[in-house]
Structure formats: C-alpha cells, structure tokens
C-alpha cells in the first residue's frame, strides 16, 4: 500500500491547478454568461420570494469551498438543464432538415477524451483520499489543503457531467432515437443536479467514494465506446460485443456499492459518530435505488431484444434454406416428370408399332408379313 507521504507527493503532482477553475469559468461565462444572467434576472423579477428563499438557503448551507468553485449558481444550473432539454427537442424536430450524421470523428474524440478524463479523476481521487487520511467510508468534509485538492477533483467530475451531454447530441445526430430513453435523460439531468448539491454542501468527505467509483466505471465504458467506433467490424469488434452487457452490469454494481456505503453510514454508524451529512446520504441511497430499478429494466429489455434478433436472424436463415431446397426439389421433380412422360410416349409408340406389325402379318400372310414387319421395323427406326 502507498504510504501517506508517497500519496501526498503523488497527489500534489497531479493536483488540478487553481487556474483551471478560474480560466474555464472566464471562458464559459464569456460565451453563456449573458444568457444565464438574463434567466436569473427573469426568475428574480417573476418569482422574487422563491429566488430569495433559495439564496438564503444557499448562504446557510454552503461549504467554505463553494465560494471558490465556479458553476455553482443554482439558476445557471437550471438554465443549463433547460438548454439541454431544449436541444433534445430541437434536434428531434429538425431531423428531416438536418439529415443523418455518422459522427464518427466526433464520437472518437469525445469518447477518448472522457475515457482519459475518467481515468485521471478515478486515480486522482483514490490517491488524494489516501493523502488526506480518508478511510473507505464515513469521512468528514474539512478545509485543509488536502481536502481542497479533493474538492477540485469532485468539481471536475461535476463539470464532466455536462460534457457527457454530448452523448445525447451524438445519438440524436445519428438519429438513434431509441437510445434517448427516459432513463438516459433522467440520469444525465439528475446526476448533474445532485453533484451540484454535493459540491455546495459537502465537497469532499463521503462524496469522494461515489465520484471515484463512477469515474472508474466510465474508464471502461468510454473506452468500450471508443474501441467500437475504432473497430466497426472484424475480430476486435466481435470480442468487444461480448462485453456489451458487462458495461451495464458494471454500472449497476456501482449503484449497489453506493447503496452499501449509504446504508453503512446511516444504519451501522451511530448517528453521533456520523461525519457526513445524513440528508445527502439518504438522497444518495434512494437515488441509487431508482437507478438500479431503471438500469435493471433496461438490461432485461435489451437482453430480450438481442435474443429476439438472434431468433429472427436464425429463422430468416432457415426459411431461406428451406425455400432454396424447395426450389431445387421442384426443379428435380419437374425434370423427372418430364422424363417420365417421354418414356411413356416411347412405350406407347412401340406398342402402336407392334400392333401395326401384327395386323400386317395377318393381312399378308407369313412371307409378306415378314417383309412388312421388316419394313415397319425399319420405319420405326
């Protein structure tokens, strides 16, 4: 196991620089800040009481780190989700105008980028948690430099949820509408809101575990998506196809681990010894239960669909072979019938010649009959 000293050195070396937060915030707000601020102003004018309530609640519950982390304005979060949902509806309505895109290059860059980012976040959180002296579960949120390092990684994880919305854009541009399900949209919107809440109230402590495990699963998930785009057919693709359902099962296992974490903290740990927000742990538990139910339903439906496709393909192949066999049999039968009719005609012709020969023999006598028979036989030849 890595010692605390070694973990501190590694964590410091891979720490997210503070300028990444400030520069990215300046860039994003320069592009979308005016629209987000206009949305907040409209809320403040039309719903002043609700706006004041949310602001007061945030001031009372915010962690000190929340003031240093960008993108935590709740009205900007709501505006982002509304923009995401509007984009889904717009791309769906304009499918005939826009046409169908392959999005292969975009998909390769997007999936590889999220694969590498997930790898960085997963390993970074693991090492930073070790450097901060965390145990597996029941960890408190502090304000030390080591915990600020963890808070920045969790913030990066939170921002990556917006980047993952590109998944939906690619599906819609490829017109794979069957993939944009209720589960897909529900998961992509709610997870963004819940991590906003975690960063606002408790950006560290127990939240490191969920972010670390989810990032680890996404390492394999986005790596799988990248490779399937890179190898659309062939031996590699055949091997990858065997892991299709393993990705969904891996996601479900992470939900199970998160449920176990919440149950351990809420049930096993005495409430006076609990170091993290009980409210956040309860939200995490029930949210994981909802995802387990939805992903389980998705897995069952997809397995049934894949089985039905295999059965349909086998049935179609068998029907094709039966049709070919019947066609070959019909041709053989027709040839045999034709050959049979020819033999019957020849037999009838011989019988007619034989009858004719007998009549001639009776009419002309033996000598003349023999001569006539010879002539008749010559004629038959």
Swiss-Prot record:
Query: What is the enzyme's class at the highest EC level?
Result: transferase
Task: Mention any one GO cellular component term assigned to this protein in its UniProt record.
Answer: endoplasmic reticulum membrane
Q: Name one GO biological process term.
A: fatty acid elongation, polyunsaturated fatty acid
Instruction: Indicate which residues form the motif HxxHH motif.
Output: 184-188
What EC number(s) does the entry state?
2.3.1.-
Transmembrane intervals: 10-30, 69-89, 107-127, 153-173, 182-202, 216-236, 280-300
Catalytic center at which residues?
A: 187 (nucleophile)
Citing just one GO molecular function, the answer is:
fatty acid elongase activity
- Note the InterPro entries from the entry: ELO_CS, ELO_fam
- Which cellular compartments is it found in? Membrane
**Where in this protein does the record put region Disordered?**
362-381
**Involved pathway(s):** Lipid metabolism; polyunsaturated fatty acid biosynthesis
Which UniProt keyword terms apply here? Fatty acid biosynthesis, Fatty acid metabolism, Lipid biosynthesis, Lipid metabolism, Membrane, Transferase, Transmembrane, Transmembrane helix
Q: Which domain of life is it from?
A: Eukaryota
> Which Pfam families did the record assign?
ELO
Q: What protein family does this chain belong to?
A: Belongs to the ELO family.
The free-text function statement in the UniProt record for this protein reads: Involved in the synthesis of fatty acids. Elongates C18 polyunsaturated fatty acids (PUFAs) with a preference for Delta6 PUFAs.
Name it.
Fatty acid elongase 6
Q: Which organism is it from?
A: Leishmania major
Quote the gene name from the UniProt entry. Answer: ELO6
């Amino acid at each position: 196991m890595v010692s605390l000293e070694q973990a501190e050195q590694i964590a410091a070396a891979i720490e997210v620089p503070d300028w990444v937060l400030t520069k990215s915030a300046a860039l994003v707000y320069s592009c979308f800040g005016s629209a987000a601020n206009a949305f907040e102003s409209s809320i403040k004018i039309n719903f002043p009481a609700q706006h004041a309530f949310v602001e007061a609640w945030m001031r009372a519950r915010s962690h000190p780190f929340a003031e240093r982390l960008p993108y935590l304005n709740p009205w900007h979060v709501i505006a982002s989700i509304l923009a995401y949902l509007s984009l889904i509806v717009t791309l769906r309505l304009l499918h005939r105008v826009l046409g169908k895109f392959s999005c292969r290059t975009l998909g390769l860059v997007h999936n590889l980028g999220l694969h590498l980012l997930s790898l960085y976040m997963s390993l970074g959180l693991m090492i930073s948690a070790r450097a901060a002296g965390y145990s597996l579960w029941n960890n408190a949120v502090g304000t030390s430099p080591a915990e600020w390092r963890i808070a920045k990684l969790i913030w990066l994880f939170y921002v990556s949820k917006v980047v993952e919305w590109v998944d939906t854009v690619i599906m819609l541009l490829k017109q794979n509408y069957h993939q944009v399900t209720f589960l897909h949209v529900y998961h992509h919107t709610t997870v963004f809101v819940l991590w906003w809440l975690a960063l606002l109230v408790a950006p560290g402590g127990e939240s490191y575990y969920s972010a670390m495990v989810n990032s680890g699963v996404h390492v394999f998930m986005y790596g799988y998506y990248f490779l399937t785009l890179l190898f659309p057919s062939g031996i590699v693709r055949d091997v990858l196809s065997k892991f299709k359902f393993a990705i969904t099962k891996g996601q479900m296992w992470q939900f199970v681990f998160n449920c176990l974490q919440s149950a351990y903290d809420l049930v096993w740990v005495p409430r006076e010894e609990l170091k993290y927000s009980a409210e956040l742990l309860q939200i995490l538990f029930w949210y994981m239960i909802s995802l387990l139910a939805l992903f389980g339903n998705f897995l069952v439906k997809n397995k049934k669909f894949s089985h039905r496709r295999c059965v349909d393909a086998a049935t179609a192949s068998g029907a094709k072979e039966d049709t070919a066999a019947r066609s070959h049999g019909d041709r053989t039968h027709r040839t045999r019938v034709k050959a049979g009719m020819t033999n019957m005609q020849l037999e009838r012709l011989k019988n007619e010649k034989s009858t004719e020969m007998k009549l001639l023999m009776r009419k002309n006598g033996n000598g003349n009959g023999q001569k006539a028979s010879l002539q008749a036989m010559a004629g038959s030849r």
